[in-house]
């Protein structure tokens, strides 16, 4: 009997071993077929063990393939064959270019625990076959093009810990059975078309930490049950149609770091239990119907960096206790019914960057201590009842980008100290007050200012000629004052509508219709006066000429000697770079197939030599780094490491890893990073042909290579496709410009700087103008009035790039006239009596009729993109479609 038992066991053992070998051969054949279809980098069937291939892990004794990670490889093709790897437990296909329907055969991967198909272009419905994956713990199909409802067949996935379906076109309601997923920690379904109520059953999910449902059409109340288990850390419900009150139970979740419930229809008061949430970092409840007083309990949330209660019905005074929030960076209380004085308690805050108290009923005076806040960039106090003088200490706000004091009851004169605010860029608004006296000439020092409004005051005297120093000025308004004399000859003034100067009875000259009435005799006298001065100057000049000539020769010799010494010193410095190289705090290369080729120490060393610098942009300088392996990478050195990066280093790294999986043919993704001291270096693929700015505006210096129209159109389409993809995955670019349209070895356009919108504040999902003002010439006009970087704003900036491509002109040129940029110059062509053909680069448009016809069609697209009204601009997806149609014009 024993013999027979042993024999049976041996036979079974041999069979199992045979089956194991057969399974291994089957997996290997499947992987070879997958590689043939997808072309996976680093996979080779030349006798190597497939278990060592990049992105693969096998089980015990290299038995079966249990993990397949092809994330971020920009792969295309059919992925159905993957379903033949029946022992898979972990499948990550995120960040590729896979399209079509998700294979239903994935439902046969019965061992699967982790499935990530996000950041692709899958279409159709969510396969009901996923309901067969009973062991699934993580399920992510976000940022695709999926439609339909969340299928009920998924309700049996009781082990789910992460359930992410965001960024699709899903409709229907959130299934009630989500509340039965007892292990659920993360549930995200934002940016879909979901309707109905948030299921009360979600309150039964004891492990829920993150709930993000923003940008849907959800209705009903916020279920109080979601707070009662006490583990919730992030709640994002913005941009829905939610009603009712914020439940008092919110205070149970002491670990909550972010509450975002703005853009809903919520009512009632903010519960005082909010003070129990000691870890709260962000609280956004703007654009609701909340009422009552702003509760002082917010002061107990010591980590709070953003408090946004704008556009509600709050009344009462601003709690002085808010001054205890030493980490507060943005305080936005605009559009309420707050009264009383501006509390002095928080005016010494070392971190406050934005203070928006506009459109309330505040009274009292502007505290002179207001500018003791060293980081303040945005000060909005307009539309209140503030009285008194503008304090002279306002000049201490040297970092301000925007100052809004309009529609108050301010008196006195405009302090000349405003001229010290040299960073003022977006707007200076002093309109609708009772200011008197003359305009201080010091305003002319504000050479970055885009918008100036001093209308509807009691200002007297003439407009100072020194205001011509405001070289960036686009919009001005001097109307309804007591100004007199001629309007200075300054292009921004003459290009402004006459309404900007009306209501000043004694003001004359263009753009006003009233002439200043100078006589010919006076003109003649002035001419003779000028001639006399010229004669005197000529005599003096001839006497000085000899002296200057001798001096110049001496100086040239001295300068040459100094330069030679400096050059020698620089050589010594560069030779000592290796000895002084700082220690690396953190660093990584995200792509496995590049890790061996990139030396992080060599990366740091390369950025310490000026000879390696390729370019300097709005946020960073770019260096060329040659690795010991011979590989060349581009290294982006951030100009100044943002506070949020240093405070949220782990979040920054996760954000970079996520962005490294953003695979698109027309995007430059980060491939790694290095952090040392307070410096962040971002690694990218080296692109040898520079950027679009160099191609268009410097090619005239290189007549041997001029980009023709087909190449330019291809670049325009590529850049548009890259930007459209960013918008699809809910990323707003912060600096769309021709210098950020980079060119690979085949002159294919790829959009750079995509990570900046996240790295300026990686802990937040939104980008605000308080982080960036953009590149001059590309800034949409509405940014002077709004505080949000938007998709329509990106479209405008892209339109400027397209105009550059069509006209070969820079965004700002002296030829346009002061205060006139490329957009205004193009849109004003008809008023100048010019035809659209005259706007185009004649070197291209006159080559052939076909080229001219395509260029005129593309010009129409550019004009739509640069419409002054954001709502009238097309979406980038539509821009791509229109430009592709241009390519097909016969």
UniProtKB/Swiss-Prot annotation:
Signal peptide interval: 1-23
Membrane topology annotation: Single-pass type I membrane protein
PROSITE patterns, A to Z: PROTEIN_KINASE_DOM, PROTEIN_KINASE_TYR
Transmembrane segments: 535-555
Placement of LRR repeats on the sequence: 67-85, 86-108, 110-132, 133-157, 159-181, 182-205, 206-229, 231-254, 256-276, 278-300, 301-325, 326-349, 350-373, 375-397, 399-421, 422-446, 447-469, 471-492
Broad class of where this protein is predominantly found: membrane
Intracellular or extracellular location(s): Cell membrane
Binding site for ATP: 614-622, 636
Matches recorded under CDD domains: STKc_IRAK
Segments on the Cytoplasmic side according to the record's topology features: 556-890
Disulfide linkage: none
Entry GO terms, CC: plasma membrane
UniProt keywords, alphabetically: ATP-binding, Cell membrane, Glycoprotein, Kinase, Leucine-rich repeat, Membrane, Nucleotide-binding, Receptor, Repeat, Signal, Transferase, Transmembrane, Transmembrane helix, Tyrosine-protein kinase
EC number: 2.7.10.1
Side of membrane Extracellular, spans: 24-534
Protein family according to the UniProt entry: Belongs to the protein kinase superfamily. Tyr protein kinase family.
Free-text function comment from the UniProt entry: Leucine-rich repeat receptor-like protein kinase that may play a role in vascular tissues development.
Protein name: Leucine-rich repeat receptor-like tyrosine-protein kinase PXC3
Species in which this protein is naturally found: Arabidopsis thaliana
Phylogenetic classification of the source organism: Eukaryota, Viridiplantae, Streptophyta, Embryophyta, Tracheophyta
């Amino acid at each position: 009997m024993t013999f027979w038992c042993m024999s049976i066991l041996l036979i079974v053992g041999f069979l199992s071993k045979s089956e194991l070998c057969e399974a291994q051969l089957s997996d290997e054949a499947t992987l070879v077929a997958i590689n043939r279809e997808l072309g996976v980098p680093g996979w080779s069937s030349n006798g190597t063990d497939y278990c060592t291939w990049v992105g693969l892990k096998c089980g015990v004794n290299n038995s079966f393939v249990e993990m397949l990670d092809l994330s971020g490889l920009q792969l295309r093709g059919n992925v159905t064959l993957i379903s033949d790897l029946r022992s898979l437990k972990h499948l990550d296909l995120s960040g590729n270019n896979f399209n079509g329907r998700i294979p239903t055969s994935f439902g046969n991967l019965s061992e699967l625990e982790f499935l990530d198909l996000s950041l692709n272009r899958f279409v159709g419905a969510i396969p009901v076959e996923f309901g067969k994956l009973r062991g699934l713990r993580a399920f992510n199909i976000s940022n695709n093009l999926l439609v339909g409802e969340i299928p009920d067949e998924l309700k049996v996935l009781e082990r789910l810990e992460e359930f992410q379906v965001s960024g699709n076109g899903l409709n229907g309601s959130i299934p009630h059975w989500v509340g039965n997923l007892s292990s659920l920690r993360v549930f995200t379904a934002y940016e879909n078309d979901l309707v109905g109520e948030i299921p009360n059953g979600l309150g039964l999910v004891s492990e829920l930490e993150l709930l993000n449902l923003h940008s849907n059409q959800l209705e009903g109340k916020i279920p109080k049950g979601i707070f009662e288990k006490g583990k919730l850390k992030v709640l994002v419900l913005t941009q829905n149609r939610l009603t009712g009150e914020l439940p008092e139970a919110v205070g149970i979740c002491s670990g909550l770091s972010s509450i975002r419930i703005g853009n809903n229809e919520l009512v009632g008061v903010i519960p005082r239990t909010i003070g129990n949430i000691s870890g709260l970092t962000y609280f956004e409840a703007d654009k609701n119907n909340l009422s009552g007083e702003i509760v002082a309990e917010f002061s107990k949330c010591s980590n709070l960096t953003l408090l946004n209660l704008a556009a509600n019905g709050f009344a009462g005074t601003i709690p002085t206790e808010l001054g205890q929030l030493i980490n507060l960076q943005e305080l936005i209380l605009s559009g309420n019914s707050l009264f009383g004085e501006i509390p002095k308690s928080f005016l010494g805050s070392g971190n406050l960057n934005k203070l928006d108290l506009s459109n309330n009923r505040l009274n009292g005076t502007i505290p002179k201590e207001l500018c003791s806040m060293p980081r303040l960039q945005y000060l909005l106090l307009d539309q209140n009842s503030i009285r008194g003088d503008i304090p002279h200490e306002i000049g201490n706000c040297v970092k301000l980008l925007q100052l809004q004091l309009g529609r108050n009851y301010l008196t006195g004169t405009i302090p000349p100290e405003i001229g010290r605010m040299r960073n003022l860029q977006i707007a200076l608004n002093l309109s609708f007050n009772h200011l008197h006296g003359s305009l201080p000439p010091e305003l002319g020092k504000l050479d970055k200012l885009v918008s100036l409004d001093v209308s509807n005051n009691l200002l007297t005297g003439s407009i100072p000629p020194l205001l011509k120093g405001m070289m960036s000025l686009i919009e001005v308004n001097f109307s309804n004052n007591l100004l007199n004399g001629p309007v200075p000859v300054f292009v921004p003034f003459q290009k402004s509508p006459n309404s900007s100067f009306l209501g000043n009875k004694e003001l004359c000259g263009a753009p006003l219709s009233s002439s200043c009435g100078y006589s010919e005799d006076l003109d003649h006298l002035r001419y003779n006066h000028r001639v006399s001065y010229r004669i005197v100057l000529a005599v003096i000049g001839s006497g000085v000429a000899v002296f200057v000539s001798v001096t110049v020769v001496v100086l040239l010799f001295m300068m040459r000697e100094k330069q030679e010494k400096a050059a020698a010193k620089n050589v010594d410095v560069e030779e000592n770079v290796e000895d002084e190289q700082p220690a690396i705090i953190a660093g990584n290369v995200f792509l496995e197939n590049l890790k061996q080729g990139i030396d992080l120490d060599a990366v740091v060393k390369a950025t310490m030599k000026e000879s390696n610098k390729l370019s300097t942009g709005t946020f960073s300088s770019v260096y060329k780094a040659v690795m010991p392996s011979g590989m060349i990478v581009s290294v982006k050195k951030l100009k100044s490491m943002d506070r949020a990066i240093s405070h949220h280093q782990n979040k920054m790294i996760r954000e970079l890893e996520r962005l490294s999986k953003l695979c698109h043919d027309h995007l430059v993704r980060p491939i790694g990073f290095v952090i040392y001291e307070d410096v962040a270096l971002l690694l990218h693929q080296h692109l040898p042909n520079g950027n679009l700015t160099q191609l268009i505006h410097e090619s005239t210096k290189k007549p041997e290579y001029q980009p023709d129209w087909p190449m330019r159109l291809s670049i325009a389409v590529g850049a548009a496709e890259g930007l459209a993809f960013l918008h699809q995955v809910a990323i707003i670019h912060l600096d769309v410009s021709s210098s950020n349209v980079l060119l690979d070895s085949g002159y294919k356009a790829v959009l750079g700087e995509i990570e900046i919108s996240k790295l300026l504040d990686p802990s937040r999902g939104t980008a605000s103008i308080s982080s960036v003002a953009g590149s001059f010439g590309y800034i949409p006009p509405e940014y002077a009035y709004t505080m949000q970087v938007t998709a329509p704003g990106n479209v405008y900036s892209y339109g400027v790039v397209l105009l550059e491509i069509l006209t070969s002109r820079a965004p700002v040129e002296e030829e346009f006239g002061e205060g006139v940029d490329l957009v205004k110059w193009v849109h004003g062509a008809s008023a100048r009596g010019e035809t659209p053909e005259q706007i185009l680069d004649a070197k291209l448009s006159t080559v052939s009729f076909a080229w001219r016809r395509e260029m005129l069609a593309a010009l129409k697209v550019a004009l739509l993109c640069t419409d002054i009204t954001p709502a009238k601009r097309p979406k980038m997806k539509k821009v791509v479609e229109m430009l592709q149609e241009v390519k097909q014009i016969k």
